[in-house]
């Protein structure tokens, strides 16, 4: 029969150098780890998707900015080219305007048969040069009067016209492309008030010769 020694109480095993209170924090730490563990189970693609959406939005904004800048640059280039052409046309038009009196003298000399010899060669060379620069002469007898390109210096009535017509070119007009440098100076004729146009007379004569309308 074993006898228990009085005055001694059994205690749980405690590692050497540790006190019984040290076992309680370990239990608490283990409990915290179990609680924090579910946080690591969140889907990592959620954050990546949000970042991808932000990147796509930023890319769309930058692309729109680039397209706007490209459009502005193209408009700038077209505007510069248009202005360059306009300035060139104005400069050429101003130069050729100074030569119009010389061309008028050449035309009068040709009409009077005085364009001969060396003067003829010089005149033809001048006309060729201004033509290469885009100068065009216009204005012909018999064409309808157009106040945008004709300047009427003489006016009369004629029974053989049906509309205001250029019957004489007093001074030819000149243009460069669509730009009129000088209008053609002309003499015009209008239909005679109360007169029957020649075309109507001829039509009436033809009807009379055919015996009029046949009755059935």
UniProtKB/Swiss-Prot annotation:
Ranges where the record places region Disordered: 1-45, 185-216
Subcellular location(s) of the protein: Cytoplasm
Keyword list, A-Z: Chaperone, Cytoplasm, Stress response
GO biological process: protein folding
GO terms under cellular component: cytoplasm
Biased composition annotated in UniProt, kind: Acidic residues: 205-216
InterPro entries in the cross-refs: GrpE, GrpE_coiled_coil, GrpE_head
Gene Ontology MF terms in the entry: adenyl-nucleotide exchange factor activity; protein homodimerization activity; protein-folding chaperone binding; unfolded protein binding
Function: Participates actively in the response to hyperosmotic and heat shock by preventing the aggregation of stress-denatured proteins, in association with DnaK and GrpE. It is the nucleotide exchange factor for DnaK and may function as a thermosensor. Unfolded proteins bind initially to DnaJ; upon interaction with the DnaJ-bound protein, DnaK hydrolyzes its bound ATP, resulting in the formation of a stable complex. GrpE releases ADP from DnaK; ATP binding to DnaK triggers the release of the substrate protein, thus completing the reaction cycle.
Subunit and partners: Homodimer.
NCBIfam families: PRK14163.1
Family: Belongs to the GrpE family.
Name recorded for this polypeptide: Protein GrpE
Source organism of the structure: Streptomyces griseus subsp. griseus (strain JCM 4626 / CBS 651.72 / NBRC 13350 / KCC S-0626 / ISP 5235)
